[in-house]
Curated annotation (Swiss-Prot):
It comes from Rickettsia bellii (strain RML369-C). Its EC number is 2.1.1.163, 2.1.1.201. This is Ubiquinone/menaquinone biosynthesis C-methyltransferase UbiE. HAMAP family: MenG_UbiE_methyltr. The keyword Methyltransferase applies. S-adenosyl-L-methionine binds at residues 68, 92. It catalyses: a 2-demethylmenaquinol + S-adenosyl-L-methionine = a menaquinol + S-adenosyl-L-homocysteine + H(+); a 2-methoxy-6-(all-trans-polyprenyl)benzene-1,4-diol + S-adenosyl-L-methionine = a 5-methoxy-2-methyl-3-(all-trans-polyprenyl)benzene-1,4-diol + S-adenosyl-L-homocysteine + H(+). The gene is ubiE. Pathway: Quinol/quinone metabolism; menaquinone biosynthesis; menaquinol from 1,4-dihydroxy-2-naphthoate: step 2/2; Cofactor biosynthesis; ubiquinone biosynthesis.
């Protein structure tokens, strides 16, 4: 029987998605606050750098694992300020997280040109060659079958389309690595317990980060999905990395 990891636990592969859904449903209303607290606000700078990888906002963009909509709404605001003709589709398998994204888009008056689709990254309900950009931020490590999700990304992108992924990665510098590991395993779950009442969700978070492939290992996975011109850029000493590639 196929098995996979849910954090450090071994589970049946077909159980992972429902467990991940449960994690995010339980913390959805405190998700943005926890991101600020856990990263000391750094996630906002990482995401700003991420959206700079999209120079042409007159584009059809698919944001997968949209969560509460941070990336898509940053893009929508930037496009609105520039007067760009952007088309944005926010996709997430978790309906509660998408509900948070919809609410934020209305509150910020950024709901124009946005579409919301409940879907799995492994089985996207879009035709081949549909999008100019595929973005995914802090989401791909939660997908049960990452290779399948990468192949779906390749399928739905147009020729010359760009794949861009922001994800936690491997810290190279030993002192930072030691501090980061201590903070991740000893502090983040406690913050999660205080703010959300759900320590287990943040145990899963830090365990999933620890298990995610290194920058170079993930680069190989992207290549095996068919992409070319693959690059990554480390941020904050490799705590996170921006991966990019093209469908040529």
């Amino acid at each position: 029987m196929n098995q996979t990891n849910f954090g450090f636990k071994k589970i049946k592969a077909n159980e992972k998605q429902s467990l991940v859904n449960s994690v995010f449903s339980n913390v959805a209303d405190k998700y943005d606050l926890m991101n600020d607290l856990m990263s000391f606000g750094m996630h906002r700078l990482w995401k700003d750098e991420f959206i700079r990888q999209i120079p042409n906002l007159n584009s059809n963009i698919l944001d997968v694992a949209s969560g509460s909509g941070d990336i898509a709404l940053k893009l929508a605001k930037k496009a609105k300020d520039r007067g760009s003709n952007i088309s944005l589709t926010l996709s997430d398998i978790n309906e509660e997280m998408l509900r948070q994204a919809k609410k934020k888009s209305i509150d910020l008056n950024l709901f124009q040109n946005l579409k919301f689709t409940v879907a799995s990254a492994e089985e996207l309900p879009f035709p081949d060659n549909s999008f100019d950009y595929y973005t995914i931020a802090f989401g791909i490590r939660n997908v049960p079958d990452i290779n399948k999700a990468l192949k779906e990304a390749y399928r739905v992108l147009k020729p010359m389309g760009k794949f861009i992924c922001l994800e936690f990665s491997k810290v190279k510098e030993s002192l930072l690595q030691d501090f980061y590991k201590f903070y991740s395993f000893n502090v983040i779950p406690k913050i999660g317990q205080i703010i959300t009442g759900n320590k287990e969700a943040y145990d899963y978070l830090v365990e999933s980060i620890d298990l995610f492939p290194s920058q170079d290992e993930f680069r190989i996975m992207i290549k095996e999905a068919g992409f070319e011109e693959i690059n990554y850029k480390n941020l904050s000493g490799g705590i996170v990395a921006i991966h990019s590639a093209y469908k040529l």
